[in-house]
Amino acid sequence: MGSKLKFAHLHQHTQFSLLDGAAKLQDLLKWVKETTPEDPALAMTDHGNLFGAVEFYKKATAMGVKPIIGYEAYVAAESRFDRKRGKGLDGGYFHLTLLAKDFTGYQNLVRLASRAYLEGFYEKPRIDREILREHAQGLIALSGCLGAEIPQFILQDRLDLAEARLNEDLSIFGDRFFIEIQNHGLPEQKKVNQVLKEFARKYGLGMVATNDGHYVRKEDARAHEVLLAIQSKTTLDDPERWRFPCDEFYVKTPEEMRAMLPEAEWGDEPFDNTVEIARMCDVDLPIGDKMVYRIPRFPLPEGRTEAQYLRELTFLGLLRRYPDRITEAFYREVLRLLGTMPPHGDERALAEALARVEEKAWEELRKRLPPLEGVREWTAEAILHRALYELSVIERMGFPGYFLIVQDYINWARGHGVSVGPGRGSAAGSLVAYAVGITNIDPLRFGLLFERFLNPERVSMPDIDTDFSDRERDRVIQYVRERYGEDKVAQIGTFGSLASKAALKDVARVYGIPHKKAEELAKLIPVQFGKPKPLQEAIQVVPELRAEMEKDERIRQVIEVAMRLEGLNRHASVHAAGVVIAAEPLTDLVPLMRDQEGRPVTQYDMGAVEALGLLKMDFLGLRTLTFLDEARRIVKESKGVELDYDRLPLDDPKTFELLSRGETKGVFQLESGGMTATVRGLKPRRLEDIIALVSLYRPGPMEHIPTYIRRHHGQEPVSYAEFPHAEKYLRPILDETYGIPVYQEQIMQIASQVAGYSLGEADLLRRAMGKKRVEEMQKHRERFVRGAKERGVPEEEANRLFDMLEAFANYGFNKSHAAAYSLLSYQTAYVKAHYPVEFMAALLSVERHDSDKVAEYIRDARALGIPVLPPDVNRSGFDFKVVGEEILFGLSAVKNVGEMAARAILEERERGGPFKSLGDFLKRLPEQVVNKRALESLVKAGALDAFGDRARLLASLEPLLRWAAETRERGRSGLVGLFAEVEEPPLVEASPLDEITMLRYEKEALGIYVSGHPVLRYPGLREVASCTIEELSEFVRELPGKPKVLLSGMVEEVVRKPTRSGGMMARFTLSDETGALEVVVFGRAYEGVSPKLKEDIPLLVLAEVEKGEELRVLAQAVWTLEEVLEAPKALEVEVDHALLDEKGVARLKSLLDEHPGSLPVYLRVLGPFGEALFALREVRVGEEALGLLEAEGYRAYLVPDREVFLQGNGGGPKEEVVPF
């Protein structure tokens, strides 16, 4: 439907006019190209921002549409600094359409959009005419839509003010100012357009036809209307909601535009001018082939270049990293070989002298140094050669400044008490990075490759991401701001979009669909890799969704509208890690806004910032580093030992013993159930085992873990029989991982050793394999086979080896990253092995806001024999605290108390000594500081137990709060000296809390049960259970198939949801004093189980256990405590295994035979390594046997008969022998 009429849309909103523009860039540009195929052009003019400018520019250019970067500004009625509503439209701001004519115009748009946010934000980001005049060069201005100032004055019949404003705009823009004419069929436009036409004639101004597009096609109007209702939080039933007056705000064809502004009335001028303006606008953004890296200048010591200073720091660093090999004497000898007299002075003088040596001299020396390919031993000469090679690549690619900047902020952080990770990603493969302190793991010891990080065959900006303690990360960003200038550093923006589930729920709300129904619909959308599938795909694969659309017309509309809105941007926010550092003020190139704390943030996202060649860094907050800080502090406080993580021995037997036992709870990367079992099976002996394990423990390579473990234990030989001619090359590379390719670096080394690739070329091969580029892969195969044949590997074997590498490339892991992160795993395990109490206290402190984690770690502490005590206002600290060999809850972990109140309690205790009573506590801490809700939580948590029984304390809060307030008031008014002080009233009498209530209160206040677990307070439940939750995996391990077990516990967190087949399912957490697990129930079992699923009640659960990497527990039936206690009884007899010799068995049998009856009998045998339960199938006794057995010294008791429950109300097979 292409048109030959010339026209360009110059006023178009996109998805970056958040919750207002419904035009997705791809759809928009495709439609523009379709409707104006000859010289298509389009202006992007989003409301008050430039969020999408770079993405729009790139996509438009790629699709053959000329991009015009614009901006619909909000102009303040008076000053941008005004913070009061004026009389103008929308509270004192008006619209104005601005287009960038050239790169200067683009820069001025950036500055205006930035200052609107940084200086003029009040409800909207506003500019004013002062800065408009300041930044008008290179801009074309259109007079605007109905919301602009001139049209508003016309509508108010204030033509003198309209003309005055027109003259002011002319004084700013001159012949770059045009009259904007729009016609959406609105009566207001008809009135305005006639006056605008007269102004154009009077002042000789060009007129321009625009359409204020907010969506792409006319049929998108309904979806746009819904989008506006999402923005305004209204529904379609609300007559007062904000909406557009008609459905004409779409991207019209040239013919439709001319129909709205007939030629007889308007002529060709408004249309021809759009084409003329499109021709005039020619912004050439420095992206793609024109992009240059914009690395800021690092502040250098006098007389140094960036390359020299990086060399100097590297040579200094090598002395400190390898003192046994790189010595001052070695450096003096190197200088002599270079023909330079070594200077007098310290190591810095030597490093400076080496740094000043010309590159040509180094090149000559490198020819005499041992080659780097296949280095077996890292001698001083080899280390120097590797460093020189890396430096030459870094210099040739132009990145010394990059390394200097990164090492500067990392070393500043370390020097100012901010914990920094040992490395992240491929940067750990660089010796230079290690020498200058960027990374903290030795790349030579672990065989890490520089080319995996910085490839001399492929010029691209290095990417060094850094982990900092998540509590201290912001300090480092602030340092960078101060170092390079507040105007040159900002965090990077990002955009949250309407994913399928969110879009569906938002649209459903607007249509008035009940919240519960909307949630049900959203839950039907499958989630893959953590992301919900698009609605279009979901409809195809989920028949329930299709059925809902067919049976309910409103739901069909909701889903269809949601599909149109899906993928639109919903909000702007701050990227979790990205920081940009610029050489010049950022607003020369990138628009800025502010986050909620007032800090500058780029309006562009990460991709746009990188596309412009700006230096982007990732400053990540890693909680493990915060944990290690906390552990070091607690160990120092508790044991007087100063932990230095950089000096820990990496072969500590105690650490590897802990890992081999599977005690990995809280150990970085190793604490999941499946990983724990794998670590226990592997029994690692060296750090390299951990590196391999975290690399293999991912979908795909996991299948090789059993082989790795067997070979690790010598149960299976390492064989290279499949590649007999290549074995001599493969063995040195793969022996470390028992012949199994694990790392990407191994691909590179094999290509290098077997086929003669340089490591840089080998990295290109790795990338090609990962991206499956067919043509490129064929070229590489030919090259690989040719090189292998030259090294004695036959063609057929070389092809097989290439096939193996190609298959492996899909799951090979980055060894540099694995090594750096495995070092953190080792460090956390070391702390747990040597300081378990301090380890658990630190872990609990950093996870105090996650009650599930706290509960899990408290159970682990108790399993290690470490008591965790409730909080105490006279003993607790802010966080969890070590007292002897026990852990005391921190006050900040008590719900409703908050950090400020916790600190106030500690400060008052420090100032006035321990609290003597509840009254003393209340008198010293006013209710404004510690409110009644916080006080109730403190009592329920046990933090005030020293002052009395919890029931009495709760009952006394009201009268004692009144007494405390009156006492403080008397003190303020000076009455205390005149009259005797009113004594503290005694605690109110109240019945003590029963144990169940007390435990429930503890969970309410602390998120967990501390003094015990309610399940132990319900006699009968535990006795029937097959095992505890903690024992479950061990219990079912040797049982065949999908064993059935009985589990008892408290029900927590019940979630019910529909299944794809139209039924219902539920998930719930079952907890006992040893742990908690998730139980799933669906199918026929759901109807019987669901009514009994209520939170905080005890249940007995018959479950089928599916064994795998993680156990899956499926409920078949459940019983309440009452049902359990009412069930038929059995007799249980406890007996020590030592008494079950021939004589003991005969004695017990004769006692049981004396009183025959109907009760089944179970024998619980207590042994040195646990206990076992046996059903005596042929024996039935009467209740009288109980007394006889007790009289004879046996421990015997009546319990509910397990067989009743194992049958699941008739739903399960009867076991011949029941091993509980």
From Swiss-Prot:
NCBIfam families per record: polc (TIGR00594), PRK05673.1 (NF004226), PRK06826.1 (NF005298)
Organism per entry: Thermus aquaticus
One CC-aspect GO term: cytoplasm
PANTHER family: DNA POLYMERASE III SUBUNIT ALPHA (PTHR32294:SF0)
Highest taxon listed in the record's lineage: Bacteria
Similarity comment text for this entry: Belongs to the DNA polymerase type-C family. DnaE subfamily.
Swiss-Prot/TrEMBL catalytic activity: DNA(n) + a 2'-deoxyribonucleoside 5'-triphosphate = DNA(n+1) + diphosphate
Sample GO molecular function, one term: DNA-directed DNA polymerase activity
Subunit details: DNA polymerase III contains a core (composed of alpha, epsilon and theta chains) that associates with a tau subunit. This core dimerizes to form the PolIII' complex. PolIII' associates with the gamma complex (composed of gamma, delta, delta', psi and chi chains) and with the beta chain to form the complete DNA polymerase III complex.
Subcellular location: Cytoplasm
Protein's GO biological process: DNA replication
Keywords: Cytoplasm, DNA replication, DNA-directed DNA polymerase, Nucleotidyltransferase, Transferase
Pfam families listed in its UniProt record: DNA_pol3_alpha, DNA_pol3_finger, HHH_6, PHP
Main location: cytoplasm
Stated role: DNA polymerase III is a complex, multichain enzyme responsible for most of the replicative synthesis in bacteria. This DNA polymerase also exhibits 3' to 5' exonuclease activity. The alpha chain is the DNA polymerase.
Name of the protein this chain belongs to: DNA polymerase III subunit alpha
Lineage, uppermost ranks: Bacteria, Thermotogati, Deinococcota, Deinococci, Thermales
Enzyme Commission numbers on file: 2.7.7.7
